[in-house]
């Protein structure tokens, strides 16, 4: 009877780890998170941001 109990506990542990690995990856902290827009001005704003950080080669581009 003791071996059966251990076998059932091991099987339950293996199944629970399989469920965690195959889950959708939703973390409790991320569930209510609001998606953040890192580039509110779109692709052109992202390009200008890169130019500003890298040192703009041509002044009219950098504004």
From Swiss-Prot:
Superkingdom, natural source: Eukaryota
Record's keyword terms, sorted: Amidation, Bromination, Calcium channel impairing toxin, D-amino acid, Disulfide bond, Hydroxylation, Ion channel impairing toxin, Neurotoxin, Secreted, Signal, Toxin, Voltage-gated calcium channel impairing toxin
Residues recorded as bearing 4-hydroxyproline in the entry: 57
Ranges annotated as biased composition (Basic and acidic residues): 28-39
Propeptide: 24-54
Reported tissue expression: Expressed by the venom duct.
InterPro entries on file: Conotoxin (IPR004214), Contryphan_CS (IPR011062)
Signal peptide (from-to): 1-23
Residue numbers bearing the 6'-bromotryptophan modification: 61
Main localization (coarse): secreted
Positions carrying Cysteine amide: 62
Annotated region (Disordered), positions in chain: 23-46
Disulphide bridges, residue numbers: 56-62
Localisation: Secreted
GO CC terms, sorted: extracellular region
Recorded domain comment: The cysteine framework is C-C.
Similarity-based family: Belongs to the O2 superfamily. Contryphan family.
Protein name: Contryphan-Am
Species for this entry: Conus amadis
């Amino acid at each position: 009877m003791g071996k059966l109990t251990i076998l059932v506990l091991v099987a339950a542990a293996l199944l629970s780890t399989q469920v965690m690995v195959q889950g959708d990856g939703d973390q409790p902290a991320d569930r209510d998170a609001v998606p953040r827009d890192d580039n509110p001005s779109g692709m052109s704003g992202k390009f200008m941001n890169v130019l500003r950080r890298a040192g703009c080669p041509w002044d009219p581009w950098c504004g």
